[in-house]
Regions:
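Short beta-strand-centered segment that lines the nucleotide-binding/catalytic pocket of NTP-utilizing
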Residues: 35-48
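Conserved small/polar residues in nucleotide/adenosyl-binding loops
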Residues: 255-260
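Conserved nucleotide-sensing/catalytic segment adjacent to the nucleotide-binding pocket
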Residues: 51-91
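Conserved mixed alpha/beta catalytic, RNA-binding, or beta-rich assembly cores of soluble enzyme
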Residues: 174-193, 199-200, 204-253
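Glycine-rich phosphate-binding P-loop
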Residues: 7-27
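Short, compositionally biased leader-like segments
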Residues: 143-180
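Extreme N-terminal, non-catalytic leader segments
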Residues: 1-6
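N-terminal leader/propeptide and maturation segments of large enzyme subunits in energy/redox metabolism
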Residues: 95-155
């Protein structure tokens, strides 16, 4: 690939997209043309200079439960510098291969460890550790319920759920940390249908139930707007006269779904 700038950023939508392969291929061709190019990577998580079991790093494990990523101490970094740094299994496993490729291309490898390749300074940007820990625990819980939904829909198996249950245990996460969980379950039990709940910035918990025209998520958002705006329950933000023709168009004319809520 022809490049015109001294710094080239290679990005892609997710893991396994070929970012590293593209960079190493370019590195090889640059050296063949006499260009002394280099390679570094920005990977936000896990954060190398936070503890291995810090909630932020555990949240990364939760986010990649489907990939079965595991945070670990970088053994190459520890051997080279005598210092502990957090990395993850895929980077550690592939480093000997990368090292050999660098030596073949450049004559010598510029890196002593996979952590050396990173330019991540996110850990130094944390100004309130307690807030980050709380947000990480909520994210772990969210990932757990997402995995449970994916399993219920047949899009995933038991392994991601089991992995997330282990991460929750390590991070001291239970459903009780989020008041919306118990509120949604109670609403679903009392109404006999799917329900949702949300914690507002002021701590109030708002719920939403399934009706003939609205799903739980839609009802929840409308109820949250009413709560924030100080609008009483007796008022409808969207009249049934507005919703009914939309539902009829969807189910009877366009036939996009048998249910107006889908």
């Amino acid at each position: 690939m022809e490049t015109t700038h001294p710094l080239v950023v290679v990005t892609a939508p997710g893991p396994g997209s070929g970012k590293m392969a593209t960079c190493l291929s370019q590195l090889y061709h640059d050296y063949k043309r006499g260009i002394a190019a280099g390679y570094a990577k920005f990977e936000t998580f896990p954060i190398w200079n936070l503890p291995l079991k810090h909630p932020v790093n555990l949240a990364y494990e939760a986010a990649t439960a489907d990939l079965n990523d595991v945070n670990m101490i970088d053994p190459f970094h520890l051997e080279a510098y005598g210092k502990t740094a957090v990395n993850y299994n895929r980077d550690v496993e592939i480093f000997p291969v990368l090292n050999a490729i660098f030596e073949k291309i450049q004559g010598t490898s510029p890196y002593q460890s996979p952590t050396d390749m990173g330019v991540n300074m996110v850990g130094n940007c944390i100004c309130d550790d307690a807030v980050c820990c709380a947000a990480s625990r909520m994210e772990i819980l969210r990932r757990y319920y997402t995995a449970c939904v994916e399993r219920l829909r047949g899009k995933a198996g038991d392994e991601p759920v089991r992995k997330l249950e282990l991460v929750m245990q390590q991070a001291s996460v239970t459903p009780d940390i989020c008041p919306a969980v118990s509120a949604a379950l109670l609403k679903a039990e009392t109404t006999g249908g799917p329900a949702g709940a949300m914690v507002l910035p002021d701590g109030r918990v708002v719920t939403g139930k399934t009706s003939d025209t609205l799903g739980a998520a839609s009802a929840l958002l409308l109820n949250a707007l009413k709560a924030v705006g100080g609008i009483g329950d007796q008022f409808e933000l969207i009249s049934a006269q507005v919703l009914e023709p939309v539902c009829r168009l969807k189910t009877c004319l366009l036939y996009t779904s048998p249910s107006p809520r889908d």
